[in-house]
Amino acid sequence: MKKKLVNLTNMYLIGDIGNTEIKIFLFNKNFIKVKKIMFKTKFISNNYLKKKLNFIKNNKIQSSLFSSVVPYAYKKIKNFLTLRFNIKSNELKNMNFSKLVKLKANRLQVGSDRIANAISVIDNKNNFIVVDFGTATTFDVIVKNTYYGGVIAPGVSLSLNTLIEKASLIPLTNLSKISKVVGTNTKLAVKSGFYWGYLGLIDNIIFMIKKQTKKPFKLIFTGGFAYMFKNLKKNKPIIKKDLTIHGLLKVIEKNN
């Protein structure tokens, strides 16, 4: 017996298009998550989207909002949603979000995912440093309700994959926490370099941000390696999953 599909109305479709991965969420009218899908950006095609986004046909989408750092991928998804489901999508940077966050940085050059992260954490009382472990490792500085800018460092996975690709004698290595600094073989040496190296990089960049701004900050981690690098020597982060999506949801709530 086939399971009966239930039509859901007044739904919100929210997506984050990254260099490596795309996340798309469906929220109901009460902003409760109904569905989440994830897939690699490199796989994007109309046939692939038909399979991954087929669930949309059973729902009435009231609003659709994306953050994207991959213009061609957003354009493909936007056109697909318009032609197949008659859904009009917006990209965050094309919207007015000045009531949620003020930008001191160059709006044209700041990724919309980073703006969404800032919107997600802003409470108009505290200052925040948001560290997002994605294709790049980004540090974003938010003071009260103002986004000041940040730091872009090489991403953990990107750096590891490049090292393995370019150095013939470096074996495939899965990163994990490691207690000893000195590795007794190549894999352990690579693990040590990435684990302790990135811990040092993160701690030092946070220290330098505090030194330059002379302000206290709450520290937020998000992204794939957030849990691996949470044990900093000098800073204790709060880990938040899907921070970008929740920032976009905040924009939807404000505009509905």
Language-model features, listed with the residues they occupy:
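Adenine-nucleotide phosphate-binding core of ATP-dependent small-molecule kinases
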Residues: 35-42, 178-215, 230, 236-237
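Gly/Thr-rich phosphate-binding beta-strand-loop-beta motif of the actin/hexokinase/Hsp70
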Residues: 8-33, 125-147, 163, 248
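Alpha-helical phosphate/pyrophosphate-handling elements in metalloenzyme active cores
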Residues: 113-117, 124
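Glycine-rich phosphate-binding loop plus the immediately following alpha-helix
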Residues: 45, 122-124, 148-192, 196, ...
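Glycine-rich phosphate-binding/hydrolytic loop that grips phosphoryl groups
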Residues: 122, 168, 237-256
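N-terminal glycine/serine-rich phosphate-binding loop of ATP-dependent small-molecule kinases
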Residues: 2-13, 17-97
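Short beta-strand-loop/turn "lid" adjacent to the catalytic site in phosphate-handling enzymes
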Residues: 58-110, 143-156, 187-195, 199, ...
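Short beta-strand segments
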Residues: 16, 67, 92, 130-136, ...
